[in-house]
Amino acid sequence: MLTTRFAPSPTGFLHVGGLRTALYSYLYARKNGGKFVLRIEDTDLKRNSEEAVIAIREAFNWCGLDYDGEVTYQSKRFDIYKEYIKKLLDEGKAYKCYMTKVELDELRAAQEAKKERPKYDGRYRDFTGTPPAGIEPVIRIKAPLNGTIEFKDGIKGDVKFNCADILDDFIIARSDGTPTYNFCVVIDDALMGITHVIRGDDHLSNTPKQIILYEALGFNLPEFFHVAMINGSDGSKLSKRHGATDVMEYKSMGYLPEALLNFLVRLGWSHGDDEIFSMSDMLKYFDPHDINKSASTYNLTKLDWLNAHYIKTLPYEHLADDMKFFGIDFRAFDKGELLLNSLRERSKTLVELKNSALNIINSPETYDEKAVAKFINTESKELLKEYAANLEDKNISAKDCEDITIAFLEKRDKKLKDIAQPIRIAITGSAVSPSIFEVIEVIGIKELKSRIAALLEKLD
């Protein structure tokens, strides 16, 4: 069965680059009826954070990326790793190295003085003597010293490494017995049945070491896909200064998971000229073999555009649920659906939508001085006062309100522009809002009259 995985280290919160990798792995597995598993690579016990693990799972839940089975923790699998280290030792494919840190530092200094690449010199590779007393050895794999390691990457094509240029007998277990990253990854990927490994191309240099271990252990090699990094707008590696990188920050900033996933899937992959991809679209069209070889560029303007699209088009019930996170339950209002629908057309984020909603739900405490100076004078104040007095205290539809208002203005030889902005200022405190008639239907005539009275009192 086609099986992919996402295997983060819990040393920090999940960033957007990691989420993109997880999304690609998820899509490929789900499209092909395969399995997608989550593995936490927490062998670095000093740097692990339980908060980071919680944040990763929270981000997956928010984005709707479900994984199969239980989460696998490497820290609970040390006994398994030790079995395979013993197997390699017993078969003569790995060995104990008693070289001290002082000796290793001296070797590196001598190599650097000769302008040679620092590497282990293999002095214990074929050692048969008596081990030095009082030294806990590391375990090293017997790596090929010559020749090449080649594989076909699903994105980059044919990849070749010269063993003499990049390899030495690298460590697979430290002196305290803990296994190293590359060793754990190979054991886990093999035992978990991972058939396709999709990961960032910062892992490309690990691949020859992992291939050596796969072959030494007799495991089948998965297909590798090394995805190019995401760059900031200035061409440098994406970092905090280019915008938020922690996935859950995007939720707090008012971005929808549908928009974020759509944004991320397009950072390195495309299908024709299409920009909008629902999850069903992604599952239909995505293929990791189509991922671009070159780095992609993070563009917040594009994310804003996508987010605005989803705010406009998602069903009311869906958006109302999302808005609860921001403290507004639109279902609690008689005209909640009308209110949300009147605001969604002009909102790029849910934070903007929240602020706009609060400007309508709550009576204004202050008024935009520039708007007041521009749109309200003695004549408009009288018109507002007369308009409020002319309204009956009963709730009416936006269409009826518009008809009543137009009739009121025509009797006085006035136009809608003569009163629209003063009404808007009375309702929201500013000259910006959706249709005033939709807003009046939401708040009701009684509240409208109260807000007009409050504005006039403030201006007197």
From Swiss-Prot:
<comment type="similarity">
    <text>Belongs to the class-I aminoacyl-tRNA synthetase family. Glutamate--tRNA ligase type 1 subfamily.</text>
</comment>
<dbReference type="GO" id="GO:0005829">
    <property type="term" value="C:cytosol"/>
</dbReference>
<dbReference type="GO" id="GO:0000049">
    <property type="term" value="F:tRNA binding"/>
</dbReference>
<dbReference type="GO" id="GO:0004818">
    <property type="term" value="F:glutamate-tRNA ligase activity"/>
</dbReference>
<keyword id="KW-0067">ATP-binding</keyword>
<keyword id="KW-0436">Ligase</keyword>
<dbReference type="InterPro" id="IPR000924">
    <property type="entry name" value="Glu/Gln-tRNA-synth"/>
</dbReference>
<dbReference type="GO" id="GO:0005524">
    <property type="term" value="F:ATP binding"/>
</dbReference>
<feature type="short sequence motif" description="'HIGH' region">
    <location>
        <begin position="8"/>
        <end position="18"/>
    </location>
</feature>
<feature type="short sequence motif" description="'KMSKS' region">
    <location>
        <begin position="237"/>
        <end position="241"/>
    </location>
</feature>
<keyword id="KW-0030">Aminoacyl-tRNA synthetase</keyword>
<dbReference type="InterPro" id="IPR014729">
    <property type="entry name" value="Rossmann-like_a/b/a_fold"/>
</dbReference>
<dbReference type="InterPro" id="IPR008925">
    <property type="entry name" value="aa_tRNA-synth_I_cd-bd_sf"/>
</dbReference>
<dbReference type="InterPro" id="IPR033910">
    <property type="entry name" value="GluRS_core"/>
</dbReference>
<keyword id="KW-0963">Cytoplasm</keyword>
<comment type="function">
    <text>Catalyzes the attachment of glutamate to tRNA(Glu) in a two-step reaction: glutamate is first activated by ATP to form Glu-AMP and then transferred to the acceptor end of tRNA(Glu).</text>
</comment>
<keyword id="KW-0547">Nucleotide-binding</keyword>
<dbReference type="GO" id="GO:0008270">
    <property type="term" value="F:zinc ion binding"/>
</dbReference>
<comment type="subunit">
    <text>Monomer.</text>
</comment>
<dbReference type="InterPro" id="IPR004527">
    <property type="entry name" value="Glu-tRNA-ligase_bac/mito"/>
</dbReference>
<protein>
    <recommendedName>
        <fullName>Glutamate--tRNA ligase 2</fullName>
        <ecNumber>6.1.1.17</ecNumber>
    </recommendedName>
</protein>
<feature type="binding site">
    <location>
        <position position="240"/>
    </location>
    <ligand>
        <name>ATP</name>
    </ligand>
</feature>
<dbReference type="InterPro" id="IPR020751">
    <property type="entry name" value="aa-tRNA-synth_I_codon-bd_sub2"/>
</dbReference>
<dbReference type="InterPro" id="IPR001412">
    <property type="entry name" value="aa-tRNA-synth_I_CS"/>
</dbReference>
<dbReference type="InterPro" id="IPR049940">
    <property type="entry name" value="GluQ/Sye"/>
</dbReference>
<keyword id="KW-0648">Protein biosynthesis</keyword>
<dbReference type="Pfam" id="PF00749">
    <property type="entry name" value="tRNA-synt_1c"/>
</dbReference>
<dbReference type="InterPro" id="IPR020058">
    <property type="entry name" value="Glu/Gln-tRNA-synth_Ib_cat-dom"/>
</dbReference>
<dbReference type="GO" id="GO:0006424">
    <property type="term" value="P:glutamyl-tRNA aminoacylation"/>
</dbReference>
<dbReference type="Pfam" id="PF19269">
    <property type="entry name" value="Anticodon_2"/>
</dbReference>
<dbReference type="InterPro" id="IPR045462">
    <property type="entry name" value="aa-tRNA-synth_I_cd-bd"/>
</dbReference>
